[in-house]
């Protein structure tokens, strides 16, 4: 035999060998025989962890988790829907995501362990297009019905103010943490960013760009979101977009919250501190 293999009686009453399963799999009963497999998971619930592996057939349990959020979002085995949404739990650790952006599918929720446990950053190198430095790309492209919560995001940079400094259309954007997915108009539920803190010198918290969609609400919702961006930008709604900010805070930003091109921001219990505009 081979190390780790198990002997058991088969359907003929003879002793047969059960080969050792993959790392993280467990020996369990399928009701008839013993088999190695993943721990049973809930429908449409997936996991990313620091000891995970980005490979097909994984993600369905914490013991067979994926290793990156981008891989998880790009390889969900079932397309999420309004009646059958997906949840991706991102366990404690720092995740350096390569070849941004992460395009979050419709009706998908990304949940970190908490602000002090799960951190998401851009990896070194270029973005998926191969021409922009990864940290000056966009971290998350959010689709209709998306929720992102309980994360700390760090590492984006590159916003350069223009003249006048209060006008973002005169400046140059660098790295952005949250933006709309051009391929997914907001027809049902706005992307909902909840309990998230972002850091970064010259980073931009969110750009809600209404010009990406010819229909839908062109909207995002931010609840308990803090942006700490020295000389950066907090949230920019542009070109007939809509943003709602509840208990949101920016610190040290060149511009805290701004709406241009017919856009609207509704802000409750929020503030911009120690910045310029």
For the regions a language model picked out, list residue spans one by one:
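Right-handed parallel beta-helix
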Residues: 147-240
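Extracellular repetitive beta-rich solenoid segments
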Residues: 1-44, 64
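Detector for repetitive beta-architecture
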Residues: 33, 45, 85-87, 92-94, ...
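Extracellular beta-strand-rich solenoid/capping regions of secreted or surface-exposed proteins
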Residues: 77-80, 96-111, 119-150, 154-187
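Residues in short coils/turns that link rungs of repeat/solenoid architectures in beta-rich domains
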Residues: 117, 155, 199-201, 205, ...
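Short, T/G/N/S-enriched strand-turn elements that build extracellular solenoid repeat scaffolds
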Residues: 17-19, 70-82, 95-105, 138-142, ...
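Acidic glycine-/aspartate-rich tracts in secreted/extracellular proteins
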Residues: 11-13, 31-33, 51-56, 93-96, ...
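Acidic Gly/Asp/Thr-rich repetitive segments characteristic of extracellular carbohydrate-active
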Residues: 50-90
């Amino acid at each position: 035999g081979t190390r780790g293999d198990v002997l058991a009686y088969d359907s003929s009453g003879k002793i047969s060998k059960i080969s050792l399963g993959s790392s993280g799999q467990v020996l369990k009963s399928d009701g008839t025989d013993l088999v190695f497999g993943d721990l049973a998971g809930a429908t449409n619930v997936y996991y990313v962890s620091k000891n995970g592996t980005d490979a097909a057939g994984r993600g369905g349990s914490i013991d067979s988790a994926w290793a990156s959020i981008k891989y998880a979002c790009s390889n969900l085995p079932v397309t999420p829907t309004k009646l059958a949404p997906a949840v991706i739990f991102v366990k404690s650790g720092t995740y350096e995501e390569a070849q941004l952006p992460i395009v979050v599918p419709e009706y998908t929720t990304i949940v970190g362990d908490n602000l002090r446990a799960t951190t998401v950053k851009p990896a070194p190198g270029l973005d998926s297009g191969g021409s922009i430095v990864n940290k000056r790309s966009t971290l998350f492209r959010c689709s209709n019905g998306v929720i992102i919560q309980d994360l700390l995001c760090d590492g984006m940079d590159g916003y350069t103010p223009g003249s006048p400094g209060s006008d973002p259309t005169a400046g140059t954007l660098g790295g952005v943490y949250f933006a709309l997915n051009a391929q997914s108009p907001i027809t049902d539920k706005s992307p909902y960013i909840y309990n998230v803190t972002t850091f970064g010198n010259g980073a931009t918290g969110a750009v809600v760009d209404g010009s990406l969609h010819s229909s839908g609400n062109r909207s995002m919702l931010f609840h308990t979101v803090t942006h700490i961006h020295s000389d950066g930008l907090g949230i920019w709604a542009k070109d007939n977009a809509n943003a709602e900010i509840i208990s949101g805070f920016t610190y040290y930003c060149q511009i805290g919250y701004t709406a241009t091109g017919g856009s609207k921001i509704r802000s409750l219990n929020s503030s911009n501190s120690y910045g310029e505009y």
